[in-house]
């Protein structure tokens, strides 16, 4: 079992149950999935970009990546319907907890000029989204073998009913929030 999953079950869930005054352990908010998305506008001109992004994201997550395609043609962006424009991966269960553990303990401390995560990046339903400017903060990526620095979006989907519950959950996981 993943280290963070064990900590959640034994320490975080009982503490949150008391803190949020919930009657049942099943009511306690938990992280259900983590979605990583990499939008690749530059892939329009070069198909190699998609292959490199897929390889990077697969190294980071240890899971097969899905290529996303344009749903509509947009002349302003020079995009045609059906062209590959990004990659994404959804992590659940043990892989999700292992990724979250690596993100909090290894990757975020490697961010240059890191001052903490924005505590206002919740969506109103307890889900949290954050952006990473460079994929090289992950130890799985070899700096010498990357072709370009690419950012990615990380979304944590929780069972929290509102932002306050979601914030309490992520604070219990020791997320380094700014304010």
Swiss-Prot record:
One of the protein's GO biological processes: translation
UniProt key word rRNA-binding: yes
UniProt entry tagged with the keyword Heme: no
Signal sequence annotation: none
Stated role: This is one of the proteins that bind and probably mediate the attachment of the 5S RNA into the large ribosomal subunit, where it forms part of the central protuberance. In the 70S ribosome it contacts protein S13 of the 30S subunit (bridge B1b), connecting the 2 subunits; this bridge is implicated in subunit movement. Contacts the P site tRNA; the 5S rRNA and some of its associated proteins might help stabilize positioning of ribosome-bound tRNAs.
Homology family: Belongs to the universal ribosomal protein uL5 family.
Quaternary organization: Part of the 50S ribosomal subunit; part of the 5S rRNA/L5/L18/L25 subcomplex. Contacts the 5S rRNA and the P site tRNA. Forms a bridge to the 30S subunit in the 70S ribosome.
Protein name per Swiss-Prot or TrEMBL: Large ribosomal subunit protein uL5
Organism this protein belongs to: Pseudomonas syringae pv. tomato (strain ATCC BAA-871 / DC3000)
Phylogenetic lineage: Bacteria, Pseudomonadati, Pseudomonadota, Gammaproteobacteria, Pseudomonadales
Gene (name only): rplE
């Amino acid at each position: 079992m993943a280290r963070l999953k064990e900590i959640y079950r034994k320490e975080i869930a009982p503490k949150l149950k008391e803190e949020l005054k919930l009657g049942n352990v099943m009511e306690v908010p938990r992280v259900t999935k983590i979605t990583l998305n990499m939008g690749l506008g530059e892939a329009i001109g070069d198909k190699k970009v998609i292959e490199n992004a897929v390889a990077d994201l697969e190294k980071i997550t240890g899971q097969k990546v899905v290529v996303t395609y344009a749903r509509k043609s947009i002349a302003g962006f020079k995009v045609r319907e059906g062209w590959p424009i990004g990659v994404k991966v959804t992590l659940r269960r043990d892989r999700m907890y292992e990724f979250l553990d690596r993100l909090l303990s290894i990757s975020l401390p490697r961010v240059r000029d890191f001052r903490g995560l924005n505590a206002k990046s919740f969506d109103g339903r307890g889900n949290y989204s954050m952006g990473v400017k460079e994929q090289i903060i992950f130890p799985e990526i070899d700096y010498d073998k990357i072709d370009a620095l690419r950012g990615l979006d990380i979304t944590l989907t929780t069972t929290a009913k509102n932002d306050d519950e979601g914030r309490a959950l992520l604070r219990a996981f020791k997320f380094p929030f700014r304010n």
